[in-house]
Amino acid sequence: MAKLILVTGLVLLLNVQLGSAYNLVCYFTNWAQYRPGLGSFKPDDINPCLCTHLIYAFAGMQNNQITTIEWNDVTLYKAFNDLKNRNSKLKTLLAIGGWNFGTAPFTTMVSTSQNRQTFITSVIKFLRQYGFDGLDLDWEYPGSRGSPPQDKHLFTVLVKELREAFEQEAIESNRPRLMVTAAVAAGISNIQAGYEIPELSQYLDFIHVMTYDLHGSWDGYTGENSPLYKLPTETGSNAYLNVDYVMNYWKDNGAPAEKLIVGFPEYGHTYILSNPSDTGIGAPTSGNGPAGPYTRQAGFWAYYEICTFLRNGATQDWDAPQEVPYAYKGNEWVGYDNIKSFSVKAQWLKQNNFGGAMIWAIDLDDFTGSFCDQGKFPLTSTLNKALDIPTAGCTAPDLPSEPVTTPPGSGSGGGSSGGGSEGSGFCAGKADGLYPVADDRNAFWHCINGITYQQHCQAGLVFDTSCNCCNWP
């Protein structure tokens, strides 16, 4: 009995020391800095207490070597990795690739042993130089989108060689081993064409399953971005387009549940309804919904942009079979996730013993708390609490929850925040949007519900009316 008590106490002690049994992996995108006004987001805006792992997206590749993409990546790398000074348990990774990167550079790199070795050597040097703890491979996708069938096996070879090189480097440098993870497909045909699941799972630390973009305007009818379950009426391949099916497919085909990280989107897909009175799931559509004022991409709204849509009178509904919400107003329709659906999915994740959650992306959450009246980072915080992520010993940043107030026209010292007075000043009577400031090319007016906010581009950039964005002069 004494031994049993001792063992039980030891297990409890280990659980306390190790923290949560789950991981919360949060992507940050290096183009979020270019969003206007309150949407602009940089590493300093990240709360380092929310996630167990942060991933910087994206790096590129030239001549089979990892490279920066943005002009200020090196500066942002430092700010990103400095977040570990405020959370000693935080791990940071650098993601390479992404959808827009395509497949050709990966195909060339994996095609020969020499090319792979060139890549691996450059990765180790790069990660150590800039202070990252690992590499996230975002090849979308091996064996698809122009990638030849042999890349399925060569991807396994690459991951195996990366893992072995990381292990050897850790011994030689007497430093913790660099992690190797991958963001992988949710579409069954892409999974089958791209991944040797049992073999890959031996070498990857985490498998980040991109369980979103399961429906969009490309379908020609409304659908949820990331439904937990299928609709009762869905048959054939449509019955595969849900989080539950995809995650269990990976598990049933050889991936350990504890390495599988479930994708959670902090954005929604928008549609134009063909008939504004037909508003349910599966309603005919005629294309993408309009771009949001911050993310500026047709068919796509950040969570905080969705909150504005809801606040402006959209009808909200709950898709009970799929455990996710949708909303509509006029001919605009959005399928998305909210606090309730994140909570439901987190409980399902725990019941199925998956390794944790991955969010795309932390810069799409309501990080200022200005849009949704749910506090700062409401979606990410929901997962943090649901997965029992420890925050002891971590120092959160003090983000402003409202724009810094300065009289319209008086200017400010830079940054992305301005201010104004309700119903007065430049924006009185004007439509919501961004407007140039006549005597200051670095500044712009941001009008929201008649309220005037003067905001500034980053130093060296000017407000460009052709794109309503900050651009090089």
Curated annotation (Swiss-Prot):
Top-rank lineage group of the source organism: Eukaryota
Signal peptide positions (record): 1-21
Catalytic activity: Random endo-hydrolysis of N-acetyl-beta-D-glucosaminide (1->4)-beta-linkages in chitin and chitodextrins
Record's keyword annotation contains 4Fe-4S: no
Domain GH18: start-end pairs: 22-390
Subcellular location: Cytoplasm; Secreted
Extent of Gly residues compositional bias: 410-421
Keywords assigned: Apoptosis, Carbohydrate metabolism, Chitin degradation, Chitin-binding, Cytoplasm, Disulfide bond, Glycosidase, Hydrolase, Immunity, Inflammatory response, Polysaccharide degradation, Secreted, Signal
Record's GO cellular component terms: cytoplasm; extracellular region; extracellular space
SMART domains on file: ChtBD2, Glyco_18
Disulfide bond positions: C26-C51, C49-C394, C307-C372, C457-C470
Region of interest (Disordered), ranges: 395-421
Principal EC category: hydrolase
Binding site for chitin: E70, W71, G97, G98, W99, N100, Y141, M210, T211, Y212, D213, W360
Ranges of residues in domain Chitin-binding type-2: 424-473
Family the entry assigns: Belongs to the glycosyl hydrolase 18 family. Chitinase class II subfamily.
Subunit structure comment from the entry: Interacts with EGFR.
Protein name, as recorded: Acidic mammalian chitinase
Organism lineage string: Eukaryota, Metazoa, Chordata, Craniata, Vertebrata
